[in-house]
């Protein structure tokens, strides 16, 4: 992928919900919830403080994170769906 977010933004590849329930019922797209977790695939350089110094982000590529259902902006690059959001929109890292 050749996408690099700017400043304190990150790009996340959402982890999609299962297509079937444990009981074998297929879930149609119309009732699936928006994903709220994903894997970080790109991060910006960081945020500038008042002195112009760049503070790097805490999150890094490969982190699995939990974020708000409506956070960020959905984009598509070379057929891959991503969500771009600020680091502060992430609730936490999933271990």
UniProtKB/Swiss-Prot annotation:
InterPro entries: Chaperonin_GroES, Chaperonin_GroES_sf, Chaprnonin_Cpn10_CS, GroES-like_sf. One of its GO terms (cellular component) is cytoplasm. Disulfide bonds: none annotated. Signal peptide: none annotated. Keywords: Chaperone, Cytoplasm. CDD domains: cpn10. One of its GO terms (molecular function) is ATP binding. It is found in: Cytoplasm. GO terms for biological process: chaperone cofactor-dependent protein refolding. The keyword Disulfide bond does not apply. It holds the Pfam family Cpn10. Heptamer of 7 subunits arranged in a ring. Interacts with the chaperonin GroEL. HAMAP family: CH10 (MF_00580). Together with the chaperonin GroEL, plays an essential role in assisting protein folding. The GroEL-GroES system forms a nano-cage that allows encapsulation of the non-native substrate proteins and provides a physical environment optimized to promote and accelerate protein folding. GroES binds to the apical surface of the GroEL ring, thereby capping the opening of the GroEL channel. Belongs to the GroES chaperonin family. NCBIfam families: PRK00364.1-2, PRK00364.1-5, PRK00364.2-2, PRK00364.2-4. This is Co-chaperonin GroES. The gene is groES.
């Amino acid at each position: 992928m050749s996408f690099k977010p700017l400043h304190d933004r990150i790009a996340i590849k959402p982890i999609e919900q299962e297509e079937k329930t444990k009981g074998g019922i297929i879930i149609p797209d119309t009732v699936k919830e928006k994903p709220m977790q994903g894997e970080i695939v790109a991060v910006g350089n960081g945020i500038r403080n008042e002195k112009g110094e760049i503070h790097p982000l805490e999150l890094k590529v490969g982190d699995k994170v939990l974020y708000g259902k409506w956070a960020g902006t959905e984009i598509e690059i070379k057929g891959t769906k991503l969500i771009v959001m600020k680091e502060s929109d992430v609730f936490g890292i999933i271990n």
